[in-house]
């Protein structure tokens, strides 16, 4: 991981579909016509009628979260309790003895006294929000805005309240079906448009819009390329940089000021990258930056400002800011000099309904005002919904904030802000931010902020299912709470980057986060870090952190979207009683110390359930990851490539990482519960090998009180054939065995007696060597068990085992990495895999080759000894890998029915709770904000000694738990 929480502040100007610039910073370590515009007639632009219903003016394209998710061939998620609206905040207490003023956009008059909701003869409500600036508003006063009223101006408060006597601006206390609203949009009627050419229409618009909205679909600013223009990357909006950028310092930033374009940039006839052209570039996984282009020589773009970091070849960029880029449905362009707006309607039809152009920069402006309460209003179609930066004690409650070109709520440099029970949807940038540089210059983060019970949807991204509809744009977090703050009971659905981000001293609890990391990654649903952090992260549910491949180099793509992410130097953080499902890594601790990860439920995370990653030794020469406690967690993998623990360091050992105990593993889809790697090599561990071991992750015996399903007395498969490897016993010679190395001298292969019986000892020659088994056939989709006796020249020597095609491209044909570490002492090693291709010499065509087992890349001059290589077909128990998670995101217990009742009713009686191995009784009570992980167990394959071989096929009952055995259930015996 490269991102490092708030250690370095880097400014970046972003600009999304709305087209206006809005600086944002964050963690660092992360074909159409070129016709020129011509004047059009002067159609009328009119504001929306008053009053207007408080409803969004764009299509709400975000689809509901599905109640059921398929996470694998035998794994699923059942999800309930996700709210579709926030709970109402409790009623405000009476506000002292202050005055009450009234506003009504339809019946009011600024000449009135403003002291009654209706009246005549000078008594009655005011009409405009601007009238408040001369109202003499003071502490303890209340301003009541009439239901159904709509204003097209910014609400500004001219005074501050006090802690005991705030100023309150609210809807009427009861009976308000349509909230009073601030609408920053100018509506363009169908008659406002004239045809420019083809599907493109134009209208007069003096002010450059922040965004366009229409009921017929989604608008984005005109751009190049379009999604699908690049055949090699059909789902991406990006072109690819042809070479690394230069390294230059400009305006205090060291990055690239020149970008090398490639053959994929093809401009239409007559098109140019002239004045006004902008470029948006994905600098690395976690940054999408933007700059104006000062020149283009046909091969290089020269930028007005340096990128945040130097750029590398293959990363993506896209272009904006020219009329010729308007070449597809749902795009728009504004010519500021001609005051003309051009648009291709989202449905490709002539304009038949109004289009809304957002032109108001801010909905509610409370900056630098203290103890003001906003309650029950609506804000839509503006740049920033509510700007309260620099304030103290401001409360934002029960407010609907929708369709924002930029931030939903700017709470930078606030103290004691309370943001509660609001609904914030479709914000171009972050929904709620306490980040001190959200608007550019750093002014300080929020402190002692409370963000509670809000519903946030589509923060920094616009989604339809898993499809990103908006243009890539840099955001930071759907909710950023600053320091010594709290985020509780919030729901976040879809975030361009992080779901909830916090600094030190925070409590992050009872939140539900779905679909983080949709535009940028190196990311988490919940993210924090830093020394002396001491935050509490508890009872949260994080699901489906996506990761973002678009804009990454095609040849080296990968995502890093975590559930809960403790980044650089994270210290003293407690991560307890959370659920993480379907992230790349459930919990990632990066260079963290003295953190506690306890009682979490980690299910179906794609790479690992817990990743502890060490790549720094700034504080300790042996590495900065130390003293962590990992205990009483449930870790359930559902993919054969996934791990329970992933423990990695650049240094000599992971032994100082911490202490592991009482963890429970569902280890049937993947038998590898832990994998550790260091500069000395790597090793995979089954649960039997992991339990009680030392040296990987800890100096103490690991998970001595832990549990793995593999040791529950049942096996996952039965042996269904004999050994496929000929001459595996080496009884009389080494026929069929081969070696290879590229550089003389050749390696030496000797058959000799050894403690394993007859063995082969291979010493690699002048270059890395390969030892190959006799040939055999494999069938795609079938499962096999490989076991072998090994001894190596050095302890913890890396043994790259590969089952591959014995010709053509020599491709691997196993569904997982089979490599392991072995020692000087003889030992037996055993593992199972599924064949990914049919390889059979009796067939014709590409499949008509043989398979073989290689020990690949044996280091020059090093030796390895091998005996008793065995490969047998196995038949998995059809229920062995079946599991599920039943998640309750709600605030009350859930009585859940069996999720398999409709499709596999017989399965319901064979399900057990991973938490205690007890059978499930339906309906199942799932506590609030919690999850139950279930697994299926068939009783037909008992395995009394837990060696993976069914009792009926086991020739060696009573094998030592954790020891590898052969297909007969026998562990290594010295001869």
Feature names for model-found ranges:
Residues 810-843:
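Extracellular carbohydrate recognition and processing domains
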Residues 921-940:
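C-terminal beta-strand-rich structural cap/linker in extracellular carbohydrate-active enzymes
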Residues 707-742:
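Extracellular carbohydrate-recognition regions
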Residues 90-92, 97-98, 114, 939-975:
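Extracellular calcium-associated, cysteine-rich motifs in secreted modular proteins
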Residues 745-768:
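Short carbohydrate-recognition loop motifs
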Residues 728-731, 771-796, 829-839, 867-869:
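Extra-cytoplasmic beta-strand recognition segments
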Residues 384-387, 406-412, 425-695, 699-700:
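Glycine- and acidic/polar-rich repeat regions and solenoidal domains
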Residues 61-389, 395, 410, 463, ...:
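Extracellular polysaccharide-degrading/modifying enzymes targeting complex plant/algal/animal polysaccharides
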